[in-house]
């Protein structure tokens, strides 16, 4: 706490010295890296990225801690700082993103959007790492994917569900609400990756795209007939006003499974 307060004062009074001082402290006392990063972000966020880079350069193993500390101290600058650190150390990007999701979830969407827009091909990997670290941030992560890399929605959704089935419902709801047209494809990909999360996926899709719930329920049940009952239950719980239509559509598509579905 003392190191954080001291760095905040230094960054505000003499910003040109912040990065050099941060690097020196990280070399002498690596356990203080997170506090130093947070202090700079609080005192003068304009130099937070430069200081974070100096800290990570002096202590690469603390990259995730540094990114999370900055995001916690000043969420508004989290995306800029994390992106700069990721550019300097690409191999630590997923760890940094996961740390932000876990310890500074309020900055998760902005950080995910910035990192994924810089490297759309990494959308699934980053989504997976962040959702595994904090399933409660899955909605924010999914929103970021839909905003900057919608073409990666299905792959990212599946990666999140596989990494942490508890993230499935929030991710499915957010993506289905943003683009109902991809809901069926996304739900099928998630079901394939994490069949044990069928009920959560179905509930999320129904909450996000209630008008398409019956149609999507049928496609989900066709993709995995053994999960039909879980799909029906999840859909009905989230869109109970449409439960009759959902069950009727599923029963019509799979008459032999009517008992389990009902």
Name every feature range the model reports, one short phrase each.
Residues 1-262:
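General marker for long, soluble alpha-helical cores
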